[in-house]
A protein has these predicted regions:
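Flexible, glycine-rich active-site loops centered on histidine and acidic residues
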Residues: 20, 24-58
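Short beta-strand segments
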Residues: 6, 31-37, 63, 208-211
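Claisen-condensing/thiolase-fold acyl-transfer catalytic domains that form or cleave C-C bonds
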Residues: 5-27, 125, 129, 136, ...
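Acidic-glycine-rich active-site phosphate/pyrophosphate-binding loop
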Residues: 32-39, 100-106, 157-169
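Condensing-enzyme catalytic core mediating Claisen C-C bond formation in acyl metabolism
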Residues: 47-122, 126, 130, 211, ...
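Short, well-ordered, mixed-charge alpha-helical segments that flank or form enzyme active sites
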Residues: 11-14, 39-43, 83-86
């Protein structure tokens, strides 16, 4: 079968969380996950904070059951949405009462991506620390046991948010300056770069995490 899983910027994490369970229980033998977005098609040139941040990109991975003797695994996953952030990142047009046929010169900006960056940042600063603490407690994991954190490259505020979550510089990947926000391809793209650069090796504990429209937060713990 083929299907879409859409949690915007954390779609890859949602897909891995769902299908790793289905591979583990034997429902599927092999699953191909493709994550890609052409953000440039919906960016508003009058909104510099988003127009200059987002990039087009794609990434892919194949999920299979670990071979006998290997300990690679997805160990924990959790997702949560705080609906008070629903209108902080959105495209108002395109569906429901505002289909593409309704677009005209007067409402054109409703069909562009709209982001209220400062509001998102404040909401993340309030919600994320407790969320991460709860996840690590449920997973029975400490920050010291995690070899590398691969966060969604949401914005340049990454270097401000990560220390608030208890992760010092050098314990996480920050490539916003090089690649921008690659939307759903962000986490797998940066994870691939970390593997290519040998920042992680087999058996290392990795934390994948990200924020998305909603405001949705997604976290995965995996042993590479």
């Amino acid at each position: 079968p083929a299907m879409d899983i859409n949690t915007t910027c954390t779609s890859f994490l949602s897909a891995v969380d769902i299908f790793s369970s289905l591979v583990d229980n034997g429902r599927y033998e092999r699953v191909l996950i493709l994550s890609g977005d052409t953000a440039s098609a919906a960016l508003n040139p009058r909104q510099p904070e988003s127009y200059e941040l987002f990039s087009d990109g794609a990434a892919a991975c194949v999920l299979v059951h670990a071979d006998k003797g290997e300990n690679s695994a997805v160990l924990y996953g959790r997702q949560k949405t705080w609906s008070e952030g629903a209108h902080d990142t959105e495209i108002r047009g395109g569906c429901g009462l505002m289909t593409a046929f309704c677009m005209n010169e007067e409402n054109r900006e409703d069909y562009y991506f709209d982001m209220k960056g400062h509001r998102i940042l404040k909401l993340c600063a309030r919600k994320l620390p407790d969320f991460v603490d709860q996840c690590l407690e449920e997973a029975g994991m400490t920050r010291e046991e995690i070899r590398l954190v691969v966060p969604h490259q949401a914005s340049r505020a990454l270097e401000m948010i990560m220390p608030r979550l208890g992760f010092a510089e050098g314990t996480y990947i920050d490539r916003v300056a090089q690649y921008g926000n690659l939307v759903s391809a962000s986490v797998p793209f940066v994870l691939c770069k970390a593997i290519e650069e040998e920042k992680v090796k087999r058996g290392d504990m990795i934390l994948l995490m990200g924020t998305a429209a909603g405001l949705t937060v997604n976290l995965l713990l995996m042993r590479y």
